[in-house]
C-alpha cells in the first residue's frame, strides 16, 4: 500500500481513517491476508488497522512494516558509514521510532503536517515482520564497500555476520539495533528482513547488457541470527518480470519451458534465486501496470506498461502462481492504489512538482500499478468511453457542419471527444481528421496526409476504424525524439526543437 491519495504527496500524505477502513475491507474481500507498507504511515492507518482487526478477530490482516531512511542520502552522502555515520544514525533512529509506533508508544514523531503525531494503538501482534531498507543503488553499495574495507565483520546481541561485505555489516548493525531495542523495551521480537532487488541480488547474470545492473551483490545470507533472536530472519526481494534486462537475455531463463509449454524466464529466475537462501523468501513487490506508456519491455509480454487492466490482472495472477510454485513464503502485489505523484524515467522531467497541479498521467508506467484505480473526478469521471452517450446530453457542439458534430469535455486526466455523424454512415466507414491546437505553436500542415489547417495544430487525430485510428503529433511536441536524438544520443545539435516542421 502506498502513502498517498491522487492529490496528496509524500510531504503531506493525508489519507483519512474511513478510507483506510474501506480499503482494509476490500483487501480482505479479495482473500489477501497481509498489507505491506514502505515506511511509517499516518496515525489513522494504525488506528484503522487496529479497529479492523478487532472487528474481524477470526480473519485479521497482518502487516509487513517497512523501515527506511531518506533515499537522497544515497547520492548526497554516498557511503553508508559516511559523514560520521549520518545514514547509520538516521536508519537506527527510524528503527527505534518504528518500534515505538508499532507498540502504540509514540507521540514524538512528526508526520506530514502533524508536528507531534500520536500513535497509541499497539498492533504488534499483527506485525508479520519488519523489512529494512530501500532498493539499493549499486554505486552506493560499491562506495560503502570500497571506503570501509576494514569493516569485515559484525557481532551484536542478536545478529552476526559471516564473510560479509562492509555494506552487509551496515545492514546487520542496523537490524541488531532494532531487535535489541524492541527486545529490551517491549520484551518482544519480530521477524526481520533486509530489502533487496534484482539489481543487487547475489547471482551473476552474464547476459545483463548494462554493467551497473549486475555490478555488486548484497547477500543477506551473510547475516545470521544468533540463538537469542527467536523470531528469526527472512528475505524480502522486489521481483519484476521486465527489469533488469538480464531476465530477457539470460539463455537459461529464456529457454525455460514451464508446465504450460511456454517460455517463462520469470519463473526460471525465481527458481535460481530461491536456491541462494536458507531462510524463508518473500517477493516484497511484484506486478505490472496498466498504463498507456511503457517504460520497460518483457520477452513474455509482461511489460512495464502498455497493458489492459484484464492483462494486468491475468499476468499478476500468473506471477503469484509462479511464486507459490517455487515455494516462496509469500508475495506482495505492487500496489494497492494508484498514486499520481509517481513518475518513470521517461516522464519525470515533464511532471509538475506541485501536487495541486498534478494530474493522472497515462504515459507514466509508475501510476498504473494499483489494483484500486484512481480516476479523475471527485465522484466520477466526466466521461467514460463505454458506448453510452448519456453524459453528453445537453452539450453544445464545438464544431458542426452538415454531416458532423464534434463535442468536447475535459477533466484532470484526459481530453474527451465525441463525434456524432449525421446520416447513415457508420463509424467503421468514416475517415475523419480532427486537428487539435493547444498553444498556437504547432504546424499548419500535415505533409503525409496532404492536409492544410487554418490555424496551427499541435496534434492530429485520425479516425479510421478500429485498426487504423491514430493520434499524430507535431515534431515540436515529440518528447521521445528530443530525449533520444538530442539529449541522449546527441544525433542532432539544436538549442531547441524546430517549430512548425509538420505533423507526422
Predicted regions and their residues:
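Active-site-adjacent substrate/metal-binding segments within catalytic domains
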Residues: 1-54
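Aromatic-rich peripheral "rim/lid" segments of glycoside hydrolase catalytic domains that contact
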Residues: 294-301, 306-307, 311, 315, ...
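Surface-exposed, glycine/proline- and aromatic-rich loop segments on solvent-exposed faces
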Residues: 397-489
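Glycoside hydrolase catalytic-domain groove-lining segments
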Residues: 207-299
Amino acid at each position: 500500500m502506498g502513502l498517498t491519495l491522487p492529490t496528496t504527496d509524500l510531504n503531506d500524505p493525508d489519507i483519512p481513517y474511513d478510507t483506510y477502513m474501506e480499503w482494509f475491507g476490500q483487501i480482505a474481500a479479495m482473500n489477501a491476508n497481509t498489507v505491506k507498507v514502505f515506511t511509517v504511515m499516518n496515525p489513522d492507518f494504525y488506528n484503522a488497522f487496529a479497529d479492523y482487526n478487532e472487528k474481524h478477530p477470526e480473519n485479521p490482516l497482518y502487516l509487513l512494516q517497512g523501515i527506511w531512511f531518506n533515499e537522497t542520502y544515497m547520492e548526497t552522502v554516498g557511503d553508508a558509514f559516511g559523514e560520521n555515520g549520518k545514514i547509520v544514525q538516521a536508519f537506527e533512529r527510524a528503527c527505534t521510532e518504528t518500534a515505538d509506533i508499532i507498540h502504540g508508544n509514540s507521540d514524538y514523531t512528526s508526520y506530514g503536517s502533524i508536528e507531534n503525531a500520536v500513535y497509541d494503538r499497539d498492533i504488534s501482534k499483527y506485525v508479520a515482520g519488519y523489512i529494512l531498507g530501500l532498493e539499493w543503488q549499486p554505486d552506493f553499495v560499491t562506495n560503502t564497500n570500497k571506503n570501509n574495507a576494514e569493516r569485515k565483520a559484525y557481532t551484536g546481541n542478536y545478529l552476526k555476520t559471516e564473510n560479509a561485505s562492509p555494506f552487509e555489516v551496515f545492514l546487520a548493525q542496523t537490524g541488531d539495533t532494532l531487535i535489541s531495542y524492541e527486545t529490551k523495551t517491549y520484551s518482544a521480537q519480530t521477524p526481520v528482513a533486509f530489502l533487496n532487488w534484482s539489481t543487487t541480488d547475489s547471482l551473476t547474470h552474464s547476459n545483463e547488457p548494462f554493467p551497473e545492473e549486475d555490478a555488486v551483490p548484497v547477500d543477506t545470507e551473510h547475516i545470521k541470527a544468533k540463538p537469542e533472536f527467536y523470531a528469526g530472519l527472512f528475505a524480502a526481494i522486489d521481483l519484476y518480470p521486465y527489469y533488469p534486462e538480464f531476465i530477457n537475455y539470460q539463455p537459461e531463463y529464456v529457454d525455460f519451458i514451464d508446465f504450460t509449454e511456454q517460455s517463462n524466464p520469470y519463473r526460471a529466475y525465481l527458481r535460481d534465486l530461491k536456491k541462494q537462501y536458507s531462510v524463508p523468501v518473500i517477493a516484497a513487490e511484484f506486478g505490472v501496470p496498466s498504463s498507456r506508456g511503457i517504460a520497460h519491455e518483457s520477452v513474455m509480454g509482461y511489460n512495464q506498461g502498455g497493458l489492459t487492466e484484464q492483462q494486468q490482472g491475468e499476468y499478476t495472477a500468473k506471477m503469484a502462481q509462479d511464486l507459490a510454485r517455487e515455494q516462496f513464503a509469500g508475495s506482495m502485489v505492487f500496489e494497492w492504489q494508484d498514486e499520481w505523484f509517481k513518475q518513470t524515467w521517461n516522464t519525470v522531467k515533464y511532471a509538475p512538482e506541485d501536487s495541486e497541479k498534478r494530474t493522472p498521467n497515462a504515459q507514466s508506467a509508475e501510476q498504473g500499478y494499483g489494483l484500486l484505480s484512481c480516476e479523475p473526478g471527485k465522484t466520477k469521471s466526466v466521461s467514460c468511453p463505454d458506448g453510452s452517450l448519456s453524459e453528453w446530453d445537453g452539450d453544445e457542439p464545438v464544431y458542426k457542419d452538415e454531416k458532423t458534430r464534434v463535442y468536447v469535455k475535459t477533466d484532470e486526466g484526459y481530453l474527451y471527444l465525441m463525434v456524432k455523424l449525421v446520416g447513415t454512415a457508420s463509424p467503421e466507414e468514416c475517415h475523419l481528421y480532427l486537428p487539435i491546437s493547444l498553444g498556437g505553436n504547432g504546424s499548419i500542415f500535415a505533409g503525409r496526409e496532404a492536409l492544410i489547417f487554418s490555424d496551427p495544430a499541435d496534434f492530429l487525430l485520425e479516425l479510421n476504424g478500429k485498426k487504423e485510428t491514430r493520434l499524430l503529433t507535431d515534431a515540436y511536441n515529440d518528447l521521445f525524439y528530443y530525449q533520444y536524438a538530442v539529449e541522449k544520443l546527441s544525433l542532432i545539435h539544436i538549442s531547441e526543437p524546430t517549430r512548425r516542421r509538420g505533423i507526422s
